[in-house]
Amino acid sequence: MPFTHSLKKILTTSTISLGLFALGTGSALADIRIGSTLSASGMAAFLGEPEAQTLKMLVDDINAAGGINSEKIKLITYDDAGDANKARTFATRLIEDDEVVAIIGGTTTGTTMAIVPVVEEAGVPFISLAGAIEVIQPVRKHTFKTPHTDRMACAKIFEDMQKRKLLKIGLLAGTDSFGASMRKQCLEIAKDYGIEIVGDETFAPADADMTPQLTNLKNRAGIQSILVLGLGAGPSVATRNYAQLAIPLPLYQSHGVASDAFIELAGSQATEGVRLPGTALLVADLLAEGDPQRPVATAYKKRFEGATGKSASTFGGYAHDALHLMVDAIRRADKAEPAAIRNALEATKGFVGTTGTVTLSPTDHLGLDLSAFRMLEIKGGKWVLVE
């Protein structure tokens, strides 16, 4: 039977532990243990912090509402600071010492891929919050994810470029795991959309100036547009440099910068006209009244912004969907055992989240298609839908 997202239906009770040690109080009923390792600090904190805040906020709401099948959840969270070795260590600790029945996390592709062999060997269901397609292709029995893949992002961007007849483009990709993976995916499918890559440059995550790479791309014969692929501060630096060089070409970014923080860091003037694929969450108030994602996205946005005083981001939305997917699976499994939760999770049908409507299967551990992405443009420092 199709599952319609409802906060009231999936609320549960929980105690929280955050950071590198448990803060939760013990309880005889705190017997459903869900673990999380997130990059709440370090270079990926702009991703991991809203994820951690979202999980805490939601379990607080869950605490107030009354439980999954009359049992409590204890959420145990560690901060891996974006370090793959720490993520692997924490995943092992969550399973062996904390005895969790499921794990949410892996903020980045690098930390996620360090966690994957641990959960697969232990047989513990894991929902990743990372973007790269390699997380779920090939399909692994216990590994799922909520963000759209980098390959999907390439396809969505190339569809828009094709419509605008921007067929000769340059790439500027980060050398981090996300940037490298998305670069590979874009190179693989460009020809399917009639796109020719006439320039291919890279940047390191800590680079403070990308003028040389952008100048090289600007001077490529016939170039019509530039696509930046990356996470963190790098894409913002590239966007500022782009404006400083007054490059008269449309600029595209990836879903890796789909948050207000990108606009704030790069500046509203520099980001004017930038396009990228994003989730419904960024334009929640602009969605049609009949859009099934509108009530989910607007409710989360209002709750998160009210609780934190910060703008809701796509990344927090990934955590929102992951937690609710896991809670729904536990309810349907009717028992908090890893194998039962995994089977129920894989049988999810019609779950409406901030990223889209999710239908999972033995051959698809993401459950989203390209229509779940929205092409967005920044105008006057705000996100708007591209018609």
Each language-model region and where it sits:
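Sec/Tat signal peptide C-region and signal peptidase I cleavage site
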Residues: L23-A30
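Segments of small-molecule ligand-sensing domains
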Residues: R303-G316, L325-W383
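Beta-alpha junction/loop-to-helix N-cap segments that form part of ligand/metal-binding clefts
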Residues: R33, F46-Q53, A65-Q137, T146, ...
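Extracytoplasmic "Venus flytrap"
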Residues: G35-K56, Y78-N85, T107-T108, L172-A180, ...
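Periplasmic-binding protein-like
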Residues: L94, D98-T107, I127-L129, G170-A173, ...
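Extracellular/periplasmic periplasmic-binding protein-like sensory domains
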Residues: T239-Y318, K382-L385
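Extracellular/periplasmic Venus flytrap/periplasmic-binding protein
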Residues: T89, I133-V135, K141-A246, G290-D291, ...
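Bacterial N-terminal signal peptides that target proteins for export
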Residues: P2-T15
